[in-house]
Amino acid sequence: MFRSIAVLSALLFAFASAKTCKYDSSDFEVYWRFANNSINMQFMNTDIKNNEWTGVGFGDDKNNFVGVFFMVSNNQVTVRTGSTTQHGPPTFTQSGTNTASVSTQALNYFPEDKTMSAVVQIPIQFNGRSLQSCQKWRFVKSGKIENGQLTRNDKSPKEKKVCPMECN
């Protein structure tokens, strides 16, 4: 427990020491800032179980948005990029295609707290879209992972209109 608090505190301090934006809800705590043509983000889901997925999507069309998705399996977190719809499971970007990659600084899962935390750097030109302009960000609570396959998410993603350039 102390270890999880120490890691989360260090991550929060790193983001809090710069000008940041924040989204906070009952299930999420997300911090981000725009720098060097990237969005530096700490994404934390505070109610996710093993064998579930979560993520953040970008785009005004709820039936077609790109995103960064986090899978918790065997108490380990992996990250992938792709696209999805309001309730559908993500379709992942194929490796080797001409898409911008997400850089991962930290991935942590604390099963006793059901908390997943990730620190990622997302390029402003992401999967064929520009994240520079104001648009809706969609925070996907969770979906199940069954036999290695992601299922649809149970709840509609929470939305927030974000203008990442105005946070710096």
From Swiss-Prot:
Residues 26-143 form the DOMON domain. Keywords: Glycoprotein, Secreted, Signal. InterPro entries: DOMON_domain. It comes from the Eukaryota. Glycans are attached at N36. One of its GO terms (cellular component) is extracellular region. Coiled coil: none annotated. Residues 1-18 form the signal peptide. It is found in: Secreted. Residues 148-168 are annotated as: Disordered. PROSITE patterns: DOMON (PS50836). Residues 152-168 have a biased composition (Basic and acidic residues). This is DOMON domain-containing protein Y73F4A.2.
